[in-house]
């Protein structure tokens, strides 16, 4: 049959095929000019490379092929696929052995696979199916799947056998692409029917002399079993000759898992670092690489494992069957020049790592490599002739496993079912990893079942797998035995020597039952080792600070420059010797000298050119020394000069950094104080400290009671004046704030100290600070805050909530109440309870938010440090006379804050005291900066300014009632809303004591009562005012309003009020005035109201109802009118005449008729 040849048209190629062809052509050899011409005239070859006499002839007239015929494009695609398959099967894309066709793919005759054989087979396929394009395309698809490892070897054999049914020459010719150990034979059975027989590494085809003795009985059951079994799932079987000679004495085959278990057993017996284990691995590697006899390996292993007969017996399972019965001197043994098969079917561990690693599941590539290595034992040496018979596929029958380590039929069925259910090979590998983890006892049955259920996501299969692994859902019973509470105190044990103590009999544990006499004589159960701890040795740890780190960074940079410059300088000296004109005369001596100094030159080239190009430059230097040396020398000199110039520039910066940080780096005391202040004086840390104490009091931890969380005695008023003196010095030298801000900050600090702590300040000093803001001189001593913070004139400019409140004395006077007996009401003796007895000297109260609390705490910290220094200097006569006393310290601090004294001089002066307390003043600059920052934050927030105004009007009264304090607190809460947490700073002027308490809405304003009567009166006062009663759970309070009568302000109404400019009326829509006075008895709780007193509450919410409320109101009106006009309304039980009369009569007529 003639085959028409069509010239290749590259423009018609598929772009995807072009890319694949281009990537695969990199592996193909260059074609001769005769092969590159078109049309191609090529002779066809069979699988053996012999000419079959069929050749193509050129056709002069081009004919248009039908769609069913094979075109030239299809042939080129096929050439690309089979060529790349042949080459990639020998070596992968990266040069390594592929996992599908591992260990050298070759033909069945042990002849290396050639690309020409693959192309010849493609020519043969094209010859037979030139008019049947669909079969040719199906063949290319099979080859693509085989190349991408989508099909295993048995799968591609089955598909090719079905595709080429009736073409035995093509079926047997496919042996060209099969890995070693796999072989296809087409033979004729006794009934003149062609039979396709497949040989695998685990099931090799029997020899021809035994074929007549052991016929293969085909069956449908065997065929199904063979099709569902992959090479990795196949079980080892004895070959046909061994079955004929001896079936009873056959040695059981071992699988891959047993090989891993054997290696782990050897590791457990002999550690990986031991000489025995390394010698055993060396024997295995020698057997793999060198041409050693299997008898030599056995003798060497027997010598290594002479003390472990069990390991030697297990090792014999991995040897071939004829080793035990045949001696090395037998003349029948034929020594093949090829390499011998490996011992067993396990891969050798690497020799580089010496430490033992954790066992991991074997990769699929390792399994395939080990199987392919084992397949060499069964490689056939004789080649079967090709016959032309019809095709009937009858796979080889699988016999029952005979190895005790082999899988049973139930396990084979289980693995087959699971693999068919899993979507891909990756999921099956995950399943194998789970089994490996379970085998290594890293997973129990429950964890294995849970992981398997997540992997397969099939309830039936999970239930079957649980029965297969015999999982039981019985709960695990753990004995609840108490832990031994013995305390390990080696100091109490008997001392045997300096480092050993003898254990008491009660501490001795039960000995292991597996010990023998040798173990008991060697192992120690009576003594323990204790490290000695001399009393004079202290563990001194060195703490690095930021200044020391800066110096270390400078030294690292200087070291890098020195290392680079020393390397380049040495390289320049060496290369200068190779640039002489007479280098050609003694070139060999120069190369030897270059070899000795290769490391120095390479380091210099890496610095100049980088690692990537350094090796290339070094190779060029060795090859062309006379020409390359001057070029490299010039380049290295140029970079050396640049780096030296850069080092000189950086040296100036390094000197400045060292001068700035040298003293501070070694002043460890200052670094510790600075780091402590940076953490302890932070905003969040101060709030967290008081909140921790509050939580301990609230939950009664360690018997704590509710009360103040912070208390400090501030008895020296002169220290407050010193704080103001240092703050003025700091503000004078500060460039962070403007001139106006400096005056306001100083005025706020002075006014706060004078009003809250009662510090008598000179009036001129306060007026001077206020004049900096163009404020009029103060009239009274306590009007400083009112001059700094402008009081809001109306509710329009205030930041209050929608409930208006009165800050004057009206409300406090109207909300006056007392506790009298009902019998005293007639006598109007309530003045007794309104007199001086209701007044208590409780000190000044200042309610503020977290910012105010942090400011007071910072002032206390500054006071505490100055007080400690003053007490230390006054108590020590030596420092008082030598350093000038406390006043001299203040002068030095003032000079330091103003900038006339350097930081180094200031620290040297403080070091004279040699006291940690005095040295705390070194961070006074940072402390004052934080105080100024908090005051500036108060100036920027209008709400905080209102808090100071409230304190000036309500809080700064030493003689007040509890009810007035509650009203003052409610005012503060309304200003700070929605912020719920407030702080109460209380100053007791007689005791000179400051107490701070954190308050939540449910906490009481006052908590220290002398007797229960005082507590009851406090409750009555809280109940009488218009705000929420303190100490009452709001969840238990039932409001006396119907829910349907309450209407809220909608967002639409709010927007309407804002657009109309009437937003102030929206906030003031609630009006409340409490003037009602009542009296009740403490015994009977009978309430008596005072005449001519009342409470007024006005709610104008109807002005701001939304559209939905209006529609509801109209609907109610319409429904009411409909009912009124109906028969059930006013017409009910009336006569028709009356109805007609009332319908026609107007309201005026009705009135006149009446």
UniProtKB/Swiss-Prot annotation:
Cited Pfam families: PAH, Sin3_corepress, Sin3a_C
Composition bias, Basic and acidic residues: 9-27
Location(s), subcellular: Nucleus
Keywords of the record: Nucleus, Repeat
Bias kind Polar residues: ranges: 32-45, 100-110, 323-337, 365-376
InterPro entries reported for this sequence: HDAC_interact_dom, PAH, PAH_sf, Sin3-like, Sin3_C
Region (Disordered): 1-71, 91-110, 199-249, 321-376, 797-824
Residue span(s) of domain PAH: 111-181, 252-322, 403-472
This protein's name: Paired amphipathic helix protein pst3
GO biological process, one term: double-strand break repair via nonhomologous end joining
Chief location bin: nucleus
One annotated Gene Ontology cellular component of this protein: Rpd3L-Expanded complex
Listed Low complexity bias regions: 228-241
GO molecular function: transcription corepressor activity
Domain of life assignment: Eukaryota
């Amino acid at each position: 049959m003639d085959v028409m040849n069509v010239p290749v048209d590259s423009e018609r190629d598929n772009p995807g095929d072009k890319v694949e062809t281009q990537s695969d052509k990199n592996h193909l050899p260059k074609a001769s000019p005769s092969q590159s011409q078109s049309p191609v005239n090529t002779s066809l070859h069979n699988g053996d490379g012999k000419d079959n006499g069929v050749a193509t002839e050129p056709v002069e007239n081009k004919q248009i092929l039908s769609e069913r015929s094979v075109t030239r494009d299809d042939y080129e695609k096929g050439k690309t696929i089979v060529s790349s398959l042949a080459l990639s099967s020998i070596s992968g894309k990266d040069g390594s052995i592929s996992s599908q066709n591992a260990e050298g793919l070759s033909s069945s005759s042990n002849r290396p696979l050639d690309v020409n054989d693959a192309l010849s087979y493609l020519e043969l396929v094209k010859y037979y199916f030139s008019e049947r394009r669909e079969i040719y395309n199906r063949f290319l698809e099979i080859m693509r799947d085989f190349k991408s490892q989508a099909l295993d070897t048995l799968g591609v054999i089955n598909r090719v056998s079905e595709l080429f049914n009736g073409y035995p020459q093509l079926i047997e010719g496919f042996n060209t692409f099969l890995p070693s150990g796999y072989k296809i034979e087409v033979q004729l059975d006794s009934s003149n029917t062609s039979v396709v027989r497949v040989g695998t590494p685990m099931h090799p085809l029997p020899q021809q002399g035994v074929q007549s003795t052991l016929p293969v009985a085909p069956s449908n059951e065997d065929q199904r079993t063979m099709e569902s079994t992959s090479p990795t799932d196949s079980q080892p079987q004895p070959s046909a000759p061994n079955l004929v000679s001896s079936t009873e004495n056959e040695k059981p085959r071992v699988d891959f898992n047993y090989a891993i278990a054997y290696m782990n057993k050897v590791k457990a017996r002999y550690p990986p670092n031991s000489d025995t284990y390394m010698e055993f691995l060396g024997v295995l590697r020698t057997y793999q690489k060198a041409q050693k006899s299997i008898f030599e390996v056995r003798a060497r292993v027997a010598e290594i494992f002479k003390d472990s007969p069990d390991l030697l017996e297990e090792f014999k399972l991995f040897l071939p069957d004829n080793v035990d019965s045949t001696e090395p001197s037998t003349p029948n043994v034929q020594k093949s020049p090829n390499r011998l098969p490996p011992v067993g079917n396990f891969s050798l561990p690497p020799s580089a790592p010496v430490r033992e690693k954790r066992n991991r599941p074997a990769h699929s590539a390792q399994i395939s490599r080990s199987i392919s290595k084992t397949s060499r034992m069964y490689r056939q040496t004789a080649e079967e002739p090709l016959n032309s018979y019809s095709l009937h596929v009858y796979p080889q029958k699988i016999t029952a496993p005979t190895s005790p380590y082999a899988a049973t039929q139930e396990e084979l069925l289980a693995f087959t079912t699971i693999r068919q259910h899993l979507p891909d090979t990756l999921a099956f590998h995950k399943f194998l990893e789970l089994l490996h983890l379970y085998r290594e006892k890293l997973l129990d049955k429950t964890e294995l079942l849970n992981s398997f259920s997540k992997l397969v996501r099939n309830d039936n299969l999970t239930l079957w797998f649980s029965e297969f692994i015999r999982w039981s859902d019985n709960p695990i019973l753990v004995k609840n035995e108490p832990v031994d509470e013995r305390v390990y105190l080696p100091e109490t044990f008997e001392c045997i020597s300096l480092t050993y103590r003898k254990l008491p009999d009660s501490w001795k544990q039960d000995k292991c039952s597996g010990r023998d006499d040798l173990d008991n004589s060697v192992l120690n159960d009576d003594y323990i080792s204790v490290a000695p701890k001399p009393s004079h040795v202290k563990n001194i740890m060195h703490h690095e600070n930021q200044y020391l780190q800066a110096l270390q960074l400078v030294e690292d940079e200087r070291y890098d420059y020195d290392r680079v410059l020393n390397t380049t300088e040495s390289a320049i000296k060496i290369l200068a010797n190779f640039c002489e004109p007479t280098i050609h005369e003694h070139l060999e001596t120069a190369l030897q000298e270059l070899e000795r100094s290769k490391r120095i030159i390479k380091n210099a080239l890496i610095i100049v050119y980088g690692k990537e190009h350094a090796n290339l430059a070094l190779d060029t230097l060795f090859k062309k020394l006379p020409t390359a040396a001057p070029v490299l020398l010039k380049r290295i000199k140029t970079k050396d000069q640049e780096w030296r110039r850069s080092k000189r520039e950086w040296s100036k910066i390094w000197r400045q950094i060292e001068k700035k940080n040298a003293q501070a780096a070694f002043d460890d005391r200052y670094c510790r104080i600075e780091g402590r202040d940076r953490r302890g004086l932070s905003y969040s840390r101060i709030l967290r400290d008081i909140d921790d104490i509050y939580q301990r009091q609230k939950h009664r931890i360690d018997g704590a009671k509710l009360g103040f969380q912070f208390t400090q005695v501030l008895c020296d008023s002169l220290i407050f004046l010193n704080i103001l003196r240092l703050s003025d010095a700091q503000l004078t030298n500060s460039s962070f704030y403007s001139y106006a801000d400096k005056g306001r900050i100083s005025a706020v600090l002075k006014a706060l100290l004078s009003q809250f702590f009662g510090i008598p300040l000179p009036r001129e000093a306060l007026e001077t600070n206020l004049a900096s803001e163009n404020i009029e001189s103060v009239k009274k001593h306590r009007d400083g805050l009112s001059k700094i913070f402008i009081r809001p004139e109306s509710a329009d400019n205030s930041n209050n909530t929608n409930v208006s409140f009165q800050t004057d004395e009206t409300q406090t006077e109207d909300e006056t109440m007392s506790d009298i007996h009902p019998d005293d009401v007639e006598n109007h003796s309530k003045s007794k309870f309104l007199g001086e007895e209701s007044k208590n000297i409780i000190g000044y109260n200042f309610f503020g938010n977290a910012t105010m609390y942090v400011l007071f705490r910072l002032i206390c910290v500054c006071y505490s440090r100055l007080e400690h220094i003053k007490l230390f200097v006054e108590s020590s006569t030596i420092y008082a006379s030598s350093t000038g006393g406390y006043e001299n310290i203040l002068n030095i601090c003032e000079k330091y804050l103003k900038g006339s004294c350097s930081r180094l001089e200031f620290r040297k002066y403080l070091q004279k005291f040699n006291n940690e307390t005095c040295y705390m003043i070194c961070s006074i600059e940072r402390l004052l900066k934080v105080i100024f920052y908090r005051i500036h934050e108060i100036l920027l927030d209008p709400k905080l300014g209102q808090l100071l105004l409230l304190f000036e009007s309500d809080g700064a009264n030493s003689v007040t009632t509890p009810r007035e304090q509650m009203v003052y607190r409610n005012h503060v809460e309304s200003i700070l809303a929605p912020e719920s947490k407030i702080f109460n700073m209380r100053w007791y002027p007689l005791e000179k004591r400051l107490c701070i308490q954190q308050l939540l809405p449910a906490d009481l304003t006052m908590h220290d009562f002398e007797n229960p009567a005082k507590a009851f009166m406090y409750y009555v006062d809280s109940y009488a005012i218009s705000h929420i009663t303190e100490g009452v759970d709001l969840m238990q309070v039932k409001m006396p309003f119907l829910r349907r009568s309450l209407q809220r302000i909608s967002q639409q109404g709010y927007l309407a009020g804002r657009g109309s400019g009437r937003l102030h009326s929206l906030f003031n829509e609630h009006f409340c005035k409490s003037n009602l006075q009542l009296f009740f008895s403490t015994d009977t709780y009978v309430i008596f109201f005072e005449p001519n007193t009342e409470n007024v509450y006005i709610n104008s919410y109807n002005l701001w109802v939304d559209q939905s409320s209006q529609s509801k109101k109209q609907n109610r009106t319409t429904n009411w009118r409909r009912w009124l006009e109906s028969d059930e309304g006013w017409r009910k039980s009336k006569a028709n005449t009356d109805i007609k009369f009332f319908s026609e009569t107007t309201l005026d007529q009705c009135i006149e008729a009446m």
